Design a protein with these regions (language model features):
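A short, surface-exposed alpha-helical micro-motif characterized by mixed small hydrophobic
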Residues: 96-98
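ABC ATPase nucleotide-binding domains
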Residues: 130-166
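Conserved ABC ATPase signature
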Residues: 30-34, 38
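Conserved catalytic motifs of ABC-family nucleotide-binding domains
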Residues: 51
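Catalytic Walker B motif of ABC-type/P-loop ATPase nucleotide-binding domains
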Residues: 55-58
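H-loop/switch region of ABC-family ATPase nucleotide-binding domains
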Residues: 90-91
Length: 166
């Protein structure tokens, strides 16, 4: 019942979930003593303890520093590689290149592009979505992935009022 204490099996499941996301060492730390990234990993572990087939993440990297963003994205990618279906919302198109096999761009609640990240996260699509000029470049030097770089220019569409950013 909902008022009972966790069983040994419950504790084992919780510890396994903490291990999966790489924070088993935080098992006994009070939640008030966790960083933002540790807290976010704890929330993902809590969801994993329910043994879901699908996990929906709404901006799991928001308000996190770069290091914790990468840690979260690595966990997301690892869980997906193990077969967990993940639906993740993000305002950072780069995240699709790091953690997605399929991605979509939504505009005013409507899906306007869907497919592999290389097909969807393009300069043209991002310019239309955000109303600014965005460069999508392949980064080498040991990284070998694409990244998005917003310029400081409004798109020509934005200047004429023809963008979709409403």
């Amino acid at each position: 019942n909902i008022f009972s204490s966790p069983t040994l099996k419950d504790r084992e499941i919780a510890l396994a979930a903490l291990e999966t996301v790489g924070i088993r060492h935080l098992a006994n730390r009070p939640c008030t003593m966790l960083s933002g990234g540790e807290w976010q990993l704890t929330l993902i572990a809590r969801a994993l303890a329910q043994e879901p087939r699908i996990m929906i993440l709404d901006e799991p990297t928001s308000h996190l520093d770069m290091g914790n963003q990468v840690r979260i994205l690595r966990v997301v990618r690892s869980l997906a590689e193990k077969g967990l279906a993940i639906i993740m919302a993000s305002h950072f198109p780069d995240h699709a290149f790091i953690a997605a096999t399929e991605t979509a761009i939504l505009d005013r609640g409507h899906m306007v592009h869907k497919g592999r990240p290389d097909e969807v996260i393009t300069a043209e699509h991002l310019e239309t979505a955000y109303g600014i000029v965005v460069k999508v470049l392949r980064i080498g030097e040991g990284v070998d992935r694409k990244a998005c770089f917003p310029t400081l220019q409004d798109s020509a569409r934005s200047a004429t009022g023809a963008d979709n950013t409403g």
